A protein has these predicted regions:
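Catalytic active-site module of serine/aspartate enzymes centered on a nucleophile-bearing elbow/loop
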Residues: 97-133
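Acidic catalytic loop of the alpha/beta-hydrolase fold
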Residues: 55, 79-83
Length: 133
């Protein structure tokens, strides 16, 4: 249903819906929204198809995550309406060399919803040589 709706209405409706669901603390500017809409123009059908296939795709990838031998910092918004925080915990459990940060009172776009905390997380992660703990 939604794939048909967004195919008919196009990227603006798709992005508007995502913004309503994805942010708790941040309101993107008109310029940011326009840029985001432009990036999805003509691609809404394939993008919604990708989202529909996401759970199946994870089944193919998940078994290989344990072999990933690089530090990974998983970050997530606690109130993510698209991908629940339980997904972050599962991903963290599958990655042998990972850290997990779940931002409280935060939606899907945590890099904007909690920009100060996110910036500090990245700064610390990079400055500490991607070390865990």
């Amino acid at each position: 249903f939604w794939r048909l709706v967004f195919t008919i209405t196009g990227a603006p409706a798709f992005i508007s819906g995502a913004n309503q669901l994805g942010y708790l603390n941040y309101s993107p500017s008109a310029e940011e929204v326009a840029d985001y809409v432009a990036s999805y123009s003509g691609r809404v059908g394939p993008v919604t198809k990708w989202f529909k296939g996401y759970p199946e795709g994870c089944k193919d990838i998940d078994p290989h995550l344990a072999t990933l031998n690089v530090p990974v910092h998983v970050f997530w918004g606690e109130q993510d309406a698209f991908l629940k925080a339980e997904n972050a915990e599962q991903l963290h459990a599958l990655l042998p060399n990972s850290a997990l940060t779940v931002f409280k009172n935060c939606g899907h776009f945590c890099y904007q919803d909690k920009e100060v905390e996110f910036t500090e997380l990245v700064r610390t992660w990079v400055c500490n040589g991607h070390k865990l703990g």
